[in-house]
Amino acid sequence: MTRPDSGSSPAPLSEARRRKRNPLPTVLGITALLGLAGFIAFGNLNKSLEYFVTPTEYQQQAAQLKGRPVRIGGLVKAVKYNPQSLELSFTVTDGGASFPVRYRGAVSDLFKENQGVVVRGEFEGQTFQARELIVKHSEQYDVPKTQAELRDLLEQSE
């Protein structure tokens, strides 16, 4: 059975109605994800920082830095080194405060009294237990030009 042709085409179907979405859940979701990423990236950053301080600064901030890894810089005094056991003990000072330091490991030939040093580690009681020892030195190196200068350099290194 066919329909009689009425001579006109059927009316076009109305466009599908678009559903209007509320942007609030999307904005809240993105904000939550950014907040979580920021917390993961920076939340524990303060705990992992290692501060560089002088002995006097450490003495003033001891309560805040207690139990945290720090780097202490100063001058070396009273060196005792056992090359067989690689045990090194010395005092680091900035002229105001001093701390005893213990370190186990190989020591640079540049390490000596009155030399600048940076030690990295933590305090155990009143003694600083260093895990890393960095000796400061001059950036300039002049090759001895005469035999006398070479002799003087060798004598100073002993």
UniProtKB/Swiss-Prot annotation:
It is found in: Cell membrane. One of its GO terms (biological process) is cytochrome complex assembly. Heme binds at H137, Y141. Residues 45-158 are extracellular. The keyword Membrane applies. GO terms for molecular function: heme binding; metal ion binding. Keywords: Cell membrane, Cytochrome c-type biogenesis, Heme, Iron, Membrane, Metal-binding, Signal-anchor, Transmembrane, Transmembrane helix. Residues 1-11 have a biased composition (Polar residues). InterPro entries: CcmE, CcmE-like_sf, NA-bd_OB-fold. It is a single-pass type II membrane protein. Residues 1-23 are cytoplasmic. It comes from the Bacteria. The keyword Metal-binding applies. One of its GO terms (cellular component) is plasma membrane. Residues 1-20 are annotated as: Disordered. The chain crosses the membrane at residues 24-44. HAMAP family: CcmE (MF_01959). NCBIfam families: PRK13254.1-1. Belongs to the CcmE/CycJ family. Heme chaperone required for the biogenesis of c-type cytochromes. Transiently binds heme delivered by CcmC and transfers the heme to apo-cytochromes in a process facilitated by CcmF and CcmH. This is Cytochrome c-type biogenesis protein CcmE. The gene is ccmE.
